[in-house]
Amino acid sequence: MHETSYKPIHRLSPDTAKKIAAGEVIERPASVVRELLENALDAGATKIHLEINAGGCALIRVSDNGHGMSPQDLLLCAEAHTTSKISSADDLLQLRTLGFRGEALASIAAVSRLHLTSTRSGPLAWHYQPKAAGTAAHVPPVPQGTEAGVLEPASLERGTVVRVEQLFENFPARKRFLGRQSAETTLCRSALIDVSLAHHPVEFRFTVDGTHKLTLLSQQTRKDRCLETQMLKGDPALFHTIEGGDCSFHFHLVLSEPAICRRERRGIFTFVNGRRIFDYGLVQALVLGSEGYFPNGTFPVACLFLTVNSERIDFNIHPAKKEVHLQDYAHIRHTLSRSVAHFYRQCTIAHYVRAEPAHAPATQGNAPTHSSPPCTGVREEPAAPCAHTPRYESLFPLPVQHAHLLPPSPPHISCEHARDCTHPAPAAEGDAPVHNHTHTGAFKVLGQVAGTFIAVERNNALYLIDQHAAHERIIFDTLQRNLGTAQILLIPYHIHPRSDEEARIMHRACTELSPAGFRFHEEPDGSWHVTAVPLHWRGSEEQLAHDILYSGKNAHDILRHVLATCACRSACKDGTILDDATLHSLVEQAFALPQSRCPHGRPIWIVIGRDELFKRIKRT
């Protein structure tokens, strides 16, 4: 065992203690930027200018037009645990500001040369330079001079200017871990963007090494600010704002349609009470709500702005306030997930309705017509108290005459019907495509294309239906409607976890899958018997074991994943030749589906309208 010499306990010097404490708050130049911007916002600023040199190491300058500080405030502001935002620990339960600990300026002063100029009513102002850590105190020949630093008269029209110079020059242990100047500049810009997103009425400007780089003007809506900063990239018409909440919280969510997606979750940004935070649970709530609408493991692009009553939230758990405790965490996540799912259902309906040609005749002749005005933009209003239902702001006009397109319960199609019809009866010579007129509207099946698509004429438009995706969705919805209905297996499946982690996964999966009709029994040796499966299950023992143990899904996702995988494996495959009866049954049920995407998010059909067909062949 390694032996060490005895060292007595001693008290650290004040300068060393300050640097250690500052290291928890000030990690890099971007940390300084975030703290100074939050101070400016707490001061009521409506215009903020950020300037940096050498990635923020040589200079960080933040000027604002807030209410400023008095000379007495300046003398105290850079001392540890001095603040105007709280007076006692009880105030932490009712925070209304971004800052509250009184540590930011003291921490910055400990690792840099700090200069503050401020005025309560210009042009007379005061300039204050706190004593830098590790240097001797300088007492100026003015009444306001103290051992803590220098205070002298200055000139400033309004607000406060904070200059941070030579960051970490007296703290080489931290400076050596900084990145290149370009990397630190990018992080400073990101910190500015994060703050600006949550405060869209405020104007921000950004200057790097004397060159103006960015201006963010005051915006009327959060969506406008998100698009202005390019945090949400794409056609503005494909982004929409959702509002919702209740008496304890309210949210604004700027969300993309399925046409805009990302390969990873980093396109989802979360803000709570004006701060950018990193919370897996909130992101996961949005992902769960969008599940089934984004194909091939893609995710939506979104900015969530959550406002929670101050007595139901705790930010005092992370030095940089990047984490938060929410009292109604589960309720908030459920509300968000439900609202996102409802949004995408409406989005699918609107896309389905927009695909219908404008001149197509309505099949409900006696139904009144109420055309909603087109979406002209996003309008944000103050939240109504206790409004439990999320509000969608002119998202998707849905005329009444299309209500018949979505019956509440589509008819059942046999899982084997389409799959096994690989040898159709030959059609009589000269047979014409059959016309159907059902509750889903009139359509004419033209036939199969490449053994993969079904060509259908409907309302003067050409539909190309992916037969596998349509059948997959029908089976998936059937499985979901029959959750809990089980069929007993004559020969039970056997699943053998190979590690403690796989055993834990099996226990969680058992809880999640049992309501669907799966029945599990654990043996003394740690293996599991599956004695029953859902009524329309078409998987195998190996497939079920793989889906549970090796899919990488968490407990909340496993049920949907297993059902979706079962539907995919049971659906008719590409190249399957279908007879006329099966084609018509599949098309009719596809048009009756509540949404036009398969469980994995791929579109079931594409629509080519009459005008587009005429345009393609150069016909007028």
Swiss-Prot record:
Pfam families named in the record: DNA_mis_repair, HATPase_c_3, MutL_C
GO biological process, one term: mismatch repair
Alphabetically ordered keywords of this record: DNA damage, DNA repair
Gene Ontology cellular component terms for the protein in this record: mismatch repair complex
InterPro entries tied to this protein: DNA_mismatch_repair_CS, DNA_mismatch_repair_MutL, DNA_mismatch_S5_2-like, HATPase_C_sf, MutL/Mlh/PMS, MutL/Mlh/Pms-like, MutL_C, MutL_C_dimsub
Regions of compositional bias (Polar residues) in chain numbering: 363-374
Region (Disordered): 360-382
GO molecular function terms noted in the UniProt entry: ATP binding; ATP hydrolysis activity; ATP-dependent DNA damage sensor activity; mismatched DNA binding
Keyword Ribonucleoprotein: no
HAMAP family in alphabetical order: DNA_mis_repair
Role description: This protein is involved in the repair of mismatches in DNA. It is required for dam-dependent methyl-directed DNA mismatch repair. May act as a 'molecular matchmaker', a protein that promotes the formation of a stable complex between two or more DNA-binding proteins in an ATP-dependent manner without itself being part of a final effector complex.
PANTHER family, per the entry: DNA MISMATCH REPAIR PROTEIN MLH, PMS, MUTL, DNA MISMATCH REPAIR PROTEIN MLH1
Protein family (similarity comment): Belongs to the DNA mismatch repair MutL/HexB family.
Full protein name: DNA mismatch repair protein MutL
Organism this protein belongs to: Treponema pallidum (strain Nichols)
